[in-house]
Amino acid sequence: MEQVEQLSGVSGILRPFKAYLKEAGLGAGDQVVYYGCPGTCTPFIELLGFAVRDLPVEQVYVPYVDEAAAKAIRPVGNVGMQVSDPAGRVDPKVIVLMGGLAMPGVPVTKEAVRAVVAAHPEAKVVGVCFMQMFAKAGWVDDFDFDLIVDAAIDPVRIWR
């Protein structure tokens, strides 16, 4: 996979993600399922979900790879998108793997992620990470990503 574009800012993360989903030909009720770490990935998942809120898809959050714990992602007035009630079903047309899954010390293995992806052979696979996490963890070659959004949060400036 080669880098095609270099964008910046939050819109540089969200616009290509939304464009990809629009081009994927998803219909009403098709699921975009985000797999990520509770707490750290969740805010980014809700931000991605907000960017695509006008598409006719269902959005689902799966903590780590525990599909039995899947939660729906729904709009909340004057807030944005929020992880909410149990999802009821997990049947992704698009799997979104968050980079937190590839970080050292996370209680999920690459093999467990590979198994959940393999359980949905018809699903497209998108990766969203920061600071080249998929490349550093060797996931770029291990997963058949259709799109990777790799953003940088560097430098971080603190003003006091």
Residue ranges and their predicted role:
Residues 1-29:
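Short N-terminal or domain-adjacent regulatory/targeting segments
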Residues 6-13, 36-41, 101-104:
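Short, glycine-rich nucleotide/cofactor-binding loops
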Residues 23-28, 55, 118-122:
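Secondary-structure boundary elements
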Residues 28-53:
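N-terminal interaction modules that seed assembly of large macromolecular complexes
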Residues 30-38, 62-63, 94-101, 126-127:
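Short glycine-rich or small-residue beta-strand-to-loop segments that form or flank ligand, phosphate
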Residues 41-42, 69-70, 132-137:
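Short, charged/polar "capping" segments at the starts of alpha-helices
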Residues 85-90, 94, 98-160:
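Glycine-rich, aromatic-bearing surface loops/beta-hairpins
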